[in-house]
Amino acid sequence: MDRYQSLFTRLAEKNQGAFVPFVTVGDPNPEQSLKIMETLVEAGADALELGIPFSDPLADGPTIQGANIRALDSKVTPDVCFDLIGQIRAKYPELPIGLLMYANLVYARGIENFYERCAKAGIDSVLIADVPTNESGEFVAAAKKFGIHPIFIAPPTASDETLQSVSELGGGYTYLLSRAGVTGAETKANMPVTALLDRLNKFDAPPALLGFGISAPEQVKEAIVAGAAGAISGSAVVKIIENNVEQPEAMLKALAEFVTPMKAATQK
């Protein structure tokens, strides 16, 4: 059984959903980034969703763009990221680890080579934000060849045809958009997602994690009540990093204090 499946099985036995924080690897620097990822897991994160720094993140709001800039200023490259992720994998063998990134970085060294490096680092899934299902053929083929789940976004406006493709091509989990637009905690998540979840279930999609604009425990609770398998929080986590760049210890404490109630909110 793969790591996502066994996670969702374990959580179901405890009547819990998943809480999954997102951070950019290498933000604000490699050494602190490793401590950040460890802190998130120790504070209760069920899985990690990670970004690889990129100079032009199209789907991201200003908070995550700032994380990219800090990491790039600290000379973080994909090689540095894979090394850090490998260290997290060694420390937490059961933890599902996903990447959320852009096609340019996948193309940079060849698609197969990229997924092979993911597999070696112990990564479970890859979501490429700017590749829709109808353009995903070569990415899905390479992902499957190396045992990596391709993850797809189910937007609130999706047609049945799109949701069927997301369900058939995707594995691990489905990234459920709570609203259209760029990422960010500034604009609160728009529920209701129940109708979208019902449609996904019709196509037997992988379990849905609700993302975009999730910044408070009550939003996590709402996602679980609506039927999502869990929630992903990115900008709210990265904002804590941004606000504490000069105080590394205070940053880790604030991150732990954010994650613990978010995880507690997944209890049904």
Swiss-Prot record:
UniProt KW keywords: Amino-acid biosynthesis, Aromatic amino acid biosynthesis, Lyase, Tryptophan biosynthesis
GO MF, one example: tryptophan synthase activity
CDD domains assigned to the protein according to its UniProt record, in alphabetical order: Tryptophan_synthase_alpha
Family recorded in the similarity comment: Belongs to the TrpA family.
Keyword check for Phosphoprotein: no
PANTHER family noted in UniProt: TRYPTOPHAN SYNTHASE ALPHA CHAIN, CHLOROPLASTIC, TRYPTOPHAN SYNTHASE, ALPHA CHAIN
GO cellular component: cytosol
The protein's assembly and partners: Tetramer of two alpha and two beta chains.
Record EC number: 4.2.1.20
Active site (UniProt): E49, D60
InterPro entries for the chain: Aldolase_TIM (IPR013785), RibuloseP-bd_barrel (IPR011060), Trp_synthase_alpha_AS (IPR018204), Trp_synthase_suA (IPR002028)
Role summary: The alpha subunit is responsible for the aldol cleavage of indoleglycerol phosphate to indole and glyceraldehyde 3-phosphate.
Cited SUPFAM superfamilies: Ribulose-phoshate binding barrel (SSF51366)
A Pfam short name: Trp_syntA
UniProt name for this protein: Tryptophan synthase alpha chain
Pathway involvement of the protein, from the record: Amino-acid biosynthesis; L-tryptophan biosynthesis; L-tryptophan from chorismate: step 5/5
Catalytic activities: (1S,2R)-1-C-(indol-3-yl)glycerol 3-phosphate + L-serine = D-glyceraldehyde 3-phosphate + L-tryptophan + H2O
